[in-house]
């Protein structure tokens, strides 16, 4: 049977991965030409992209380290 810590760890890893993907996509969109259709000249869209850009910048390295450490831990637990 799976314990609560394993379930919470899996949920945490999933949320962190989704946030990293969304933030990475925001970084890509932010670097596009300002006249592109993706920017849509919308203040709310640009504000959301900027927020995800900063989140992506601040969690990229720690998030990657956490995901790697969790992966190594799961490998060690299996053997």
From Swiss-Prot:
* Virion surface side stretches: 30-47
The entry's localization annotation reads:
Virion membrane
State if Metal-binding is listed as a keyword.
Answer: no
Q: Which InterPro entries match?
A: Poxvirus_I5
Q: Which GO terms describe its cellular component?
A: membrane; viral envelope; virion membrane
What is this entry's stated membrane topology? Answer: Multi-pass membrane protein
Looking at the keywords, is Membrane present? yes
**For side Intravirion, which residue ranges?**
2-8, 69-79
Q: Which Pfam families match?
A: Pox_I5 (PF04713)
Query: Transmembrane residues, as ranges?
Result: 9-29, 48-68
Q: What induces it?
A: Expressed in the intermediate phase of the viral replicative cycle.
Q: Which UniProt keywords apply?
A: Late protein, Membrane, Transmembrane, Transmembrane helix, Viral envelope protein, Virion
Its annotated function is as follows: Envelope protein.
Provide the family line. Answer: Belongs to the orthopoxvirus OPG081 family.
Per its record, how is this protein called by name? Protein OPG081
Instruction: Look up and give the organism this protein is from.
Output: Vaccinia virus (strain Western Reserve) (VACV)
* Phylogenetic classification of the source organism: Viruses, Varidnaviria, Bamfordvirae, Nucleocytoviricota, Pokkesviricetes
